[in-house]
């Protein structure tokens, strides 16, 4: 079991702790499939809602919060029945807008894993306005059930009434709908190919800047992030922050970054290169490879 979960395990019901410890191996990064959830329900004798609430300390252990020291864990449950954990991320000494919220982390985890719809979000503190707006961008976002400790389960519409969302801007394929943008680049570099593939899957209906970041560690492992825009603009999640959140979930240190690539579309009305470089240089002494590709 990874050391970062030791304190969390001590706070779990004994039967649940015993059942989940074998799942928290060196490769665990916050994903449990539907079958594992059923196994944990059987072993713990908890209802699914109580189980997911009980697992929040595990999710919160994924956080990196050098500024606030305030650990927030979130779990996104997909239509598939799988769950995806996430936690907040802060960059030491850097502006707060670089931060990733736990709900963003969990939802991006689900998105990168191929999930097409989020049905439930479980979180250990009430979602802030930023996160409510971020979740409202999802497929049927207003119907997403929000679960909080000692609170009645309510749909997002309860927490964000009279919401402004993608429908108000005539967007009919919201976040997590499969995106397939054709981007053209001739390269034999596996890392660049991976970045182009993720950029083609990014969600940027407002600026058309289909973009992605891939980070490579010194042992050759890659971690990706895609651009996820929001109708309210500011809650958009940048690909570098998504990639860093991805690394944090996998328990990798940012000092291990050996290479970083940003791909973005030539037809976008904005560029992410400045913000991406700021975040990268805050965590690693690596130069950003910035490639603009043609969109078909």
Curated annotation (Swiss-Prot):
Catalyses: cytidine + H2O + H(+) = uridine + NH4(+); 2'-deoxycytidine + H2O + H(+) = 2'-deoxyuridine + NH4(+)
In the record, the note on similarity to other proteins reads:
Belongs to the cytidine and deoxycytidylate deaminase family.
Question: Which cofactors does the annotated protein need, by name?
Answer: Zn(2+)
Report the CDD domains cross-referenced here.
cytidine_deaminase
Decide whether keyword Metal-binding is in the record: yes
NCBIfam families, A to Z: PRK09027.1 (NF006537)
Q: How does it assemble?
A: Homodimer.
* One Pfam family hit: dCMP_cyt_deam_2
State the organism of origin.
Answer: Shewanella piezotolerans (strain WP3 / JCM 13877)
What does the protein in this record do? Answer: This enzyme scavenges exogenous and endogenous cytidine and 2'-deoxycytidine for UMP synthesis.
- Where are the catalytic residues? 103
Q: Which GO terms describe its cellular component?
A: cytosol
Q: What name is this protein filed under?
A: Cytidine deaminase
Task: Please tell me whether the keyword Metal-binding is annotated for this protein.
Answer: yes
Residues binding Zn(2+), per UniProt:
101, 128, 131
Recall the GO molecular function terms of this protein's record: cytidine deaminase activity; identical protein binding; zinc ion binding
GO-annotated biological processes:
cytidine deamination
């Amino acid at each position: 079991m990874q050391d970062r979960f030791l304190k969390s395990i001590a706070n779990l019901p004994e039967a649940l702790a015993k059942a989940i410890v074998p799942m928290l191996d060196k490769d665990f990064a916050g994903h449990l499939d539907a079958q594992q959830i059923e196994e944990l329900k059987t072993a713990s004798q908890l209802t699914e809602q109580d189980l997911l609430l009980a697992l929040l300390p595990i999710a919160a252990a994924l956080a990196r919060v050098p500024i606030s020291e305030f650990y927030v864990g979130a779990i996104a449950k997909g239509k598939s029945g799988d769950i995806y954990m996430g936690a907040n991320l802060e960059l030491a000494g850097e502006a707060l807008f670089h931060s990733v919220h736990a709900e963003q982390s969990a939802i991006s985890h689900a998105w990168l894993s191929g999930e097409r719809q989020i049905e439930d979000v479980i979180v250990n503190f009430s979602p802030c306005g930023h996160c409510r707006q971020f979740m409202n961008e999802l497929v049927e976002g207003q119907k997403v059930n929000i679960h909080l400790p000692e609170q009645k389960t309510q749909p997002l519409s309860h927490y964000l009434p009279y919401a402004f969302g993608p429908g108000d801007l005539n967007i009919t394929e919201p976040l997590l709908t499969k995106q397939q943008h054709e981007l053209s680049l001739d390269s034999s570099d596996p890392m660049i190919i991976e970045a182009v593939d993720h950029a083609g899957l990014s969600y940027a209906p407002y600026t058309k800047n289909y973009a992605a970041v891939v980070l490579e560690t010194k042992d050759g492992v890659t971690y990706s992030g895609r651009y996820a825009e929001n109708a309210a603009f500011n809650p958009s999640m940048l690909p570098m922050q998504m990639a860093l959140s991805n690394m944090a979930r996998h328990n990798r240190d940012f000092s291990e970054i050996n290479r970083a690539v940003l791909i973005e579309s030539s037809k976008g009305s904005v560029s992410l290169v400045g913000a991406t470089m700021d975040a990268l240089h805050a965590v690693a002494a690596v130069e950003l490879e910035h490639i603009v590709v043609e969109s078909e």
